[in-house]
Amino acid sequence: MIAAALPSFSATAEDPRTKLVLAALKLFSDKGFEGASTREIADAAGANISAIRYYFGDKAGLYRAAFSEPLGDQPAQACAEIDPNQPLDQALQAFFAAFLAPLKRGEEVRMVMKLHFREMIEPTGAWTEVIDSEIRPQHDMLVHMLARRFDAPPDDLEVKRLAVSVVGMAVHYFVGHQVVNVLAPQLIANPEAIDLLATRLAFYAAAMIDAEGARRRAEGLWR
């Protein structure tokens, strides 16, 4: 599956709401939630400070928008459309293609990752919402696929260990975005490279799943 570059969030930057989100993303990622004032954000966006209340309710609402909206359609939404009962190789390809799609947004991803790292150090509670709305649905879908593969219950700890390991391959391209850009920038240089990356990660994940199957057979846990 070859996909074109996703339109960047800033492509709609003439919209006043989008201008506020982009200004907030930059300032929150640079200064943190406490360090960036609503006045400063409004000035950077060329907006009246009252627009923050109008569009987002308050500073916390603006922070939540900056935390996730620039990534575009949430990967969790795309993953929800994947049929976990289809052949495993097809499901894995669809999963990684959806998961990696935000990388096609370029610089905005770098700023979002910077903000996410800052959130880990200076927590505001935004991660709790992200886990519930984005990460948990992805994890549950992958666990369902793997549990079905091994005729195992969804609370099987080894299935969960494998699911976390599989998705960890893709997560690195987000949290290690700057590192990858230094060590091997060609891997995420353009939409075609990202599509190829999704295909390769699906291939690697299938090998990991086969290895887990071999372990289960050797221990008499699966036929």
Label for each model-derived stretch:
Residues 1-15, 26, 214-223:
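N-terminal intrinsically disordered/low-complexity leader segments
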Residues 2, 128-136, 145-202, 214-221:
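Hydrophobic/aromatic-rich alpha-helical bundle segments in the mid-to-C-terminal region
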Residues 14-22, 55-79, 128, 132:
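An amphipathic alpha-helix adjacent to DNA-recognition modules
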Residues 16, 20-28, 99, 205:
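Short hydrophobic clusters on alpha-helical segments that form packing/core surfaces
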Residues 19, 27-61, 65-66:
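Helix-turn-helix
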Residues 59, 66, 70, 92, ...:
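Hydrophobic/aromatic residues within well-ordered alpha-helical segments
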Residues 79-112, 159-166:
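Hydrophobic alpha-helical connector segments
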Residues 107-132, 177-183:
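Amphipathic alpha-helical segments used for helix-helix packing
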